[in-house]
Amino acid sequence: MKKVMELVDVWKIYDLGEVKVEALRGVSFEVFEGEYVIIIGPSGSGKSTLLHILGCLDRPTKGKVLIEGEEVSRMGDRRLAQVRNRKIGFVFQSYNLLPRLTALENVELPMIYAGVPAKERKRRAKELLELVGLGDRLHHRPNQLSGGQQQRVAIARALANDPVFILADEPTGNLDTKTGEEILELFRKLHEMGKTLVVVTHNLEMVDEGTCIVRIRDGRIEGIERRGVVYGDT
């Protein structure tokens, strides 16, 4: 299997003057193409910090982060922004859609930054919205959509540049049970399509869906389970 991401002995230390906080302590793991990775752990375990490192939104204090074999942890800001735009698709708990743009325009946005021609990006945005079941909501703005529909737009946007992997932060966290199940089904569909998914969640149903479960506690990897094989402490 092709390795799409790797963390090697990653530490994140926050210097708060007299106190140093070790948010991540020697984290190492790999993500392979087509995996459905679920990251779980209690509050304060380092999940949010790990999410930021995985998404190239923050840099490790020490250690390496590699995407498709290329070390990204020491890249300059401009190059790192290109990596985020082209190789990572983000899905946030709060959707993060631009309120003045339509669903179609929100999905087009990452492609504009990537330099995709207007005709092609409109075609692809429409195709992606149809994929997530919103072919009849192309020209609706976020305030005209339900929470579940907004999250579907966010998922379509995440797929816009055909990223190496999708990184999702509590994608069902703001949704009711029924709508959350619909989003869960959509992630299931993406996994079946061969997409690589990395999800931070408390949703136990999502944990059941994952092909790789990463458990984090006190800034360390407590264990990694892959299809019945367990690595690390149990």
UniProtKB/Swiss-Prot annotation:
Domain ABC transporter residues, every copy: 5-234
GO biological-process terms attached to the record: transmembrane transport
Amino acids binding ATP: 41-48
Regions that span the bilayer: none
GO molecular function: ATP binding; ATP hydrolysis activity; transmembrane transporter activity
Cytoplasm in keyword set: no
Recorded GO CC terms: plasma membrane
Keywords: ATP-binding, Nucleotide-binding, Transport
Record-annotated disulphide pairs: none
Gene3D superfamilies for the chain: P-loop containing nucleotide triphosphate hydrolases
Pfam families linked: ABC_tran
Homology family: Belongs to the ABC transporter superfamily.
Protein name per its UniProtKB record: Uncharacterized ABC transporter ATP-binding protein TM_0352
Origin species: Thermotoga maritima (strain ATCC 43589 / DSM 3109 / JCM 10099 / NBRC 100826 / MSB8)
